[in-house]
């Protein structure tokens, strides 16, 4: 992965491959973002033809919006905070169901400069949800706020791309 971030060749290539596979399969994606603040959706919608594959996105930056808009259980948020693997999973499921997409992608984590919910800067959880399963990955990323956010976008797109390729096999 490159450090150039959304709009970089790697990000564009990943997003392009995702859109191509979604379109070929007649499938769609919806995105729920916290620390990336819409960057995953922006990377996807930069690709021509994305309107046939991207249902939309929700930027639930505030913790209470994760419950209100994405059906993340309030109890989970109260007990664990927003930076927790099961929160990423619930966000991905929630956005997929709420926006009526084949796949849901979610990002939550700590971009910095300060720790959050007892988690150090660079702790990130990403998830991809489909009807039959939800996959969550925990990342420990280094760098400043911008680099952590850029890497999260690339890793999220790569996780979705991997899931799409599994469907082809």
Regions picked out by a protein language model, each given a short descriptive name:
Residues 1-169:
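Short alpha-helical segments enriched in small residues
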């Amino acid at each position: 992965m490159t450090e150039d971030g959304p709009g970089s060749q790697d990000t564009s290539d990943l997003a392009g491959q995702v859109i191509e596979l979604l379109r070929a399969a007649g499938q769609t994606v919806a995105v729920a973002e916290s620390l990336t603040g819409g960057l995953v959706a922006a990377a996807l919608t930069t690709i021509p033809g994305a309107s046939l594959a991207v249902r939309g996105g929700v930027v639930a930056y505030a913790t209470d919006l994760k419950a209100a808009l994405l059906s993340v259980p309030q109890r989970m948020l109260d007990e664990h905070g927003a930076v927790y693997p099961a929160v990423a999973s619930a966000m991905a499921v929630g956005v997929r169901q709420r926006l009526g997409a084949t796949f849901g992608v979610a990002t939550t984590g700590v971009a910095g400069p300060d720790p959050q919910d007892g988690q150090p800067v660079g702790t990130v959880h990403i998830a991809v949800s489909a009807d039959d399963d939800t996959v969550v990955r925990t990342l420990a990323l280094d760098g400043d706020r911008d680099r952590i956010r850029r890497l999260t976008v690339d890793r999220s797109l790569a996780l979705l791309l991997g899931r799409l390729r599994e469907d082809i096999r």
